[in-house]
A protein has these predicted regions:
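A short, N-terminal "cap"/entry segment at the start of jelly-roll beta-barrel domains
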Residues: 1-26
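Short beta-strand segments in beta-sandwich/barrel cores
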Residues: 39-40, 56-61
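A cytosolic small-molecule/anion-sensing beta-strand core signal
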Residues: 54-55, 70, 89
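Short acidic-glycine-tyrosine-enriched beta hairpin
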Residues: 64-79
């Protein structure tokens, strides 16, 4: 699957806008477009989530982790682990979900 940036559809979940950039057999790549007013409450899903911060500043909480993330930082959250994401400064994050998040389609 190839998605040209001009063709990436804007979607929304928890009030956060995002684009699905690619869907493979077992994983998907999304670009999250966080606004300062966005908030991702504590939740869990059956997908492993790995992310890379392109821009912005965030507070990520999961397990015993409570970290501030900025451009260049990355993270991995195991499946079924409750986590939350507080937006401190607007920006973009690339997230990879394995398996594919059906609720994002």
């Amino acid at each position: 699957m190839i998605v040209k940036s001009a063709n990436a559809q804007l979607r929304e979940f928890y009030g956060v806008q995002f684009q699905v950039l690619a869907i493979g057999q077992n994983s998907m790549v999304c670009k999250m477009l966080y606004r300062k007013t966005d908030s991702v409450p504590a939740h869990a899903h059956p997908n492993e989530q790995s992310g890379y911060v392109i821009s912005g500043k965030y507070k990520l909480k999961f397990g015993n982790n409570n970290q501030i993330l900025e451009a260049g930082d990355s993270y991995a959250i195991p499946e079924n682990v409750e986590h939350s994401f507080e937006i401190l400064e607007a920006g973009e994050v690339v997230d990879v979900f394995t398996p594919i998040r059906q609720d994002y389609l």
